[in-house]
Amino acid sequence: MSEAIASKEERLVAYNANIAAADKDPSLSPETGKPLSKVNTIRFGAGFLVFGILWMSGLGIVSAVLLPMHYKTIEGADPDALVGIVNAFTAVASLVSNLMFGNFSDRSRSRFGRRTPWIVFGAVLGGVTLFLTGTTHNAVLLTIFYCACMFGLNCMIAPLVAVLSDRVPSGIRGTMSAFYGAGSTIGAPIGTMIGAFFIENLTVGFAVAGVLMFLGGIVAVIILPKERSADFLPKEEGSFKDILVSFRPPKFAGAHDFYKAFAGRFCMLMSYQMINVYQLYIIQNYIGQSVKESAVTVSVVSMIMMVMSLVGSFISGPVSDLI
């Protein structure tokens, strides 16, 4: 029976049956209960790859190059101190928004699916506020816009990452994760190289960054196979208190792998960002290069990082599926 004429009850039964079948057979999609076609496999891989490249390129333009330069234009501000203050606020915004939008998308029951509307909304919010970050010379407004950008970014990331468990067979999730990881890893140095090109034209650079982040969510939705309607799923019952409780992290006793992955990723990103965020200041203030010289150095370093990231990402995904 086609989805168009099936009742909501029949669609719910089929939905649960598909998930049960996929739990037993790693080649089956939890969404359809069938193996992915070659075309859809390619579309998932391409969608995750392009999404990672675009949003990370947009953010990389700003975080690694343009924003450190922009801090120097704010009268009376200490750029070094401002980097730490703004990043502290955006770190909190990222943590809260990732949990929040992941939870909200789980509870969505849209005819466009649970994830798609949030990805589109996040693309608009993230792109617009990333551009606005470069239009103000007020430290408070800048922090507000940049935090809003983190909300938009995580409004895309949390639902899109959930697509892996919602729609992709477990047997190829490692490979698909590698496509996303490769995209975001490649996107960072690409963004830095683009940012170096606009190091003396900040406003245009911020506009390009905003467009790239916006396109990240929109293009991903277009490339990925169309998400099925979620209007047949039963609504999540509960009070506001129940919603708050749902944000609680899992207990350590039953989630060892979660906390191992969390700790590993936290340490990896912290060590990377310790250098990346202050990279431009290190090159200009410690090494002593001019603005134009530092742009060339940033581009060369980014090219090296991109090549090595490509090699690592495309090896790790398939290997993880075999283990």
Show which residues each predicted segment covers.
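Helix-to-loop junctions at the C-terminal end of transmembrane segments
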Residues: N98-F112, G312-I323
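Juxtamembrane intracellular "pre-TM" segments in multi-pass secondary transporters
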Residues: E3, E9-I42, E227-A263
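Cytoplasmic helix-loop-helix junction between adjacent transmembrane helices
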Residues: A148-G183
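Symmetry-related core transmembrane helices of the 12-TM Major Facilitator Superfamily/SLC fold
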Residues: F121, V204-I222
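Helix-loop boundary and gating motifs at the non-cytosolic
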Residues: P26-A91, Y259-G264, M268-G288
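Glycine-rich segments within core transmembrane alpha-helices of 12-TM secondary carriers
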Residues: T90-L95, G174-F197
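C-terminal ends and interior cores of transmembrane alpha-helices
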Residues: V120-H137
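Residue-level signature of mid-helix packing/kink "hotspots" within the transmembrane helices
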Residues: A91-L95, L99, A188-P189, M306-F314
